[in-house]
A protein has these predicted regions:
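Flexible "cap/lid" subdomain of the alpha/beta-hydrolase fold that forms the substrate-access gate
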Residues: 1-8, 15-17, 23-25, 29, ...
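Catalytic histidine-centered segment of alpha/beta-hydrolase-like enzymes
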Residues: 271-283
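Typically the conserved alpha-helix immediately C-terminal to a functionally engaged Cys/Sec
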Residues: 45-48
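Active-site glycine-rich loops that stabilize anionic/oxyanionic intermediates
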Residues: 35-38
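Active-site machinery of serine-nucleophile hydrolases
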Residues: 51-61
Length: 300
């Protein structure tokens, strides 16, 4: 995986981030942020397809993969999306960039959303994969969503309930959660799956990921509420899975129009793990949007 990429560690925001990065430093930078319970390896099919147009930067988020997993606090601020976004801002400044395109999937999309709110001057355009706004998802939760996204409500339980239960057999938990969400038709490559499972066997990673979700249900919502009625100004493109819970449970575009001033989007015929299932489609849509090429937007 990532044959044309370098691997490095960067000291940012008081922690060490593991980063995969292409060496075409004269190209416009784009950051790809992974989701739960994965690592930057989820981009191994998409990232190489972007190299003709971008310098591609793929970090492991704090708490995930080979990045540091700092101890948390009672308010879960250590794993708030604001703190995680500040990691990415510090990373990009250290790499010499003050403006970049931004792509996020799942938890990484939530970090990207917060980054664009707090540091909008740095984000040229943003593509978010298979999420609706977090606060609005909680506010509009019904039994169908709670059933499909059961892990949202399991991982937020008081320490150490989810940590101990997952830690008894992290491989089985990972496979049951992700293979089910992928419709039992997994497109995870052997190398990527090994990286995911190896990373998730770490007790610190399990705890950090629980803290990520605890933050989402508490301090992240508080930060959203502090934003008031101001809408995100960054040009935003939403792609969500026709075979996923977001499509079934929410009016995705309506929720995003409540939060963003310049938003387009569409559903695609895939599952939640679209970057690994239909990488060519996702890569082309990223290129088209972020390079301001004309594209036809349709959504159901």
């Amino acid at each position: 995986m990532f044959e044309k990429f370098n691997e490095t560690y960067l000291e940012v925001n008081g922690i060490r981030l593991f980063v995969r990065k292409s060496d075409n430093v004269n190209a416009p930078p784009i950051v790809l942020l992974h989701g739960y319970p994965q690592t930057s390896a989820m981009w191994h099919k998409v990232a190489p397809m972007l190299l003709d147009d971008f310098e591609v930067i793929c970090p492991d988020l704090r708490g995930y993969g080979r990045s540091d997993k700092p101890s948390s606090d009672e308010l879960h601020e250590t794993y708030s999306k604001r703190t995680m976004a500040n990691d990415i801002v510090a990373m990009m400044r250290q790499l010499g960039h003050d403006k970049f395109d931004l792509v996020g999937h799942d938890r990484g999309a939530r970090v990207a959303h917060r980054l664009a709110i707090d540091h909008g001057e740095m984000v040229k355009s943003m593509v978010l994969l298979d999420i609706a706004p977090g606060r609005e998802m909680y506010e509009n939760t019904r039994s169908d969503f709670a059933h499909a996204y059961w892990h949202w409500f399991f991982l937020t339980q008081k320490y150490p309930i989810p940590e101990q239960m997952i830690g008894l057999d992290p491989d089985s938990y990972w496979k049951l959660k992700c293979f089910n969400q992928a419709g039992h038709n997994s497109s995870f490559s052997e190398d990527a799956l090994k990286e995911y499972l190896d990373a998730f066997r770490d007790d610190a990673a399990i705890h950090a990921s629980c803290e990520d979700y605890r933050a989402a249900a508490t301090i992240d919502i508080a930060h959203d509420n502090e934003d008031g009625t101001d809408k995100l100004a960054t040009p935003l493109y939403i792609i969500w899975a026709k075979k996923g819970a977001i499509e079934k449970c929410f009016d995705v575009m309506d929720l995003w129009r409540q939060r963003a001033a310049k938003v387009t989007g569409e559903s695609v015929d895939t599952t939640h793990y679209m970057a690994e299932e239909i990488p060519l489609v996702i890569a082309q849509k990223i290129i088209n949007f972020c390079t301001n090429q004309v594209m036809e937007i349709t959504h159901d």
